[in-house]
């Protein structure tokens, strides 16, 4: 992450607010990341809509090191196409992208890529990939994009493989982005993972649920809090409060998914861990 200084952050925030106000309405309705009044849950619900309409072959697109490979000249060109022509603004955006990284006490300027961690990064990522969104729209494809996570939905495996090959070529030729040959794949919904969710069919209808990796992360976070309490002799009340925050946050994020059975199993595990802690105090 490229964490900007206070002054840089203020300038970036000012530019980001102006760009968002000017450009957000021009972005694709199928782009959900880093945009006002949009969320990951809305993106996942849109994927469910496609799948239940019969577009149940998924192209799970993986752009290699997206933020590290954004082409500066191409980005400035796209901004000009969107009537962002103020020379001072464009100069500041380019300076931000070229801020570089510190290695062995020396600053190495960046020739490509966008530093992550600043207020400008999200809007710039959407500006750059909006070209891709419009290309998919022009082709009449069903897709959902959240930042650099993009899934495309079609009705047959043959179409999916053809589209995957075509959009991979387009991204490399037009936006100079490399698509991972090993991570990009054509799958059925049950094998697809998007924003921490996967899919299952219940009574003839597709539903979403937390992926196994997402479930394991919840276990790991709670387990670490319980172990950490022992290591630093933290009060049991503080530990329970922190675990409650983790669990409530997790459930809130995955609230649109099927998870009753998992929550029951997880609850039993957590109650057992808590009982052990309480017994050890006596």
Name these PLM-found stretches:
Residues 98, 174-242, 246-248:
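A conserved non-catalytic segment of reverse transcriptases
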Residues 26-38, 42-191:
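Conserved polymerase palm-domain catalytic core
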């Amino acid at each position: 992450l490229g964490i900007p200084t206070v002054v840089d952050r203020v300038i970036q925030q000012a530019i980001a607010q102006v760009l968002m106000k000017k450009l957000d309405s021009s972005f694709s309705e199928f782009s959900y990341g880093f945009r006002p009044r949009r969320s990951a849950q809305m993106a996942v619900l849109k994927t469910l809509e496609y799948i239940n309409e019969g577009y149940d072959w998924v192209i799970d697109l993986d752009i290699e090191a997206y933020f590290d490979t954004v082409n500066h000249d191409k980005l400035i060109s796209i901004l000009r196409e969107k009537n962002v022509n103020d020379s001072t603004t464009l100069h500041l955006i380019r300076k931000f992208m070229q801020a570089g990284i510190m290695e062995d006490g020396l600053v190495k300027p960046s020739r490509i890529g966008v530093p992550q961690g600043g207020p400008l990064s999200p809007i710039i990522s959407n500006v750059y990939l909006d070209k891709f969104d419009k290309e998919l729209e022009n082709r009449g494809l069903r897709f959902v994009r959240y930042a650099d996570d993009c899934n495309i939905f079609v009705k047959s495996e043959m179409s999916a493989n053809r589209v995957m090959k075509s959009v991979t070529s387009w991204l490399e030729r037009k936006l100079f982005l490399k698509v991972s040959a090993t991570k990009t794949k054509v799958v059925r919904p049950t094998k697809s993972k998007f924003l921490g969710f996967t899919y299952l069919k219940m009574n003839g209808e597709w539903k979403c649920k937390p992926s196994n990796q997402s479930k394991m992360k919840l276990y790991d976070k709670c387990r670490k809090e319980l172990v950490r309490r022992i290591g630093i002799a933290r009060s049991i009340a503080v530990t329970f409060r922190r675990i409650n925050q983790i669990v409530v946050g997790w459930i809130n994020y995955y609230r649109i998914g099927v998870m009753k059975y998992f929550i029951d199993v997880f609850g039993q595990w957590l109650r057992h861990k808590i009982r052990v802690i309480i017994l050890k105090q006596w």
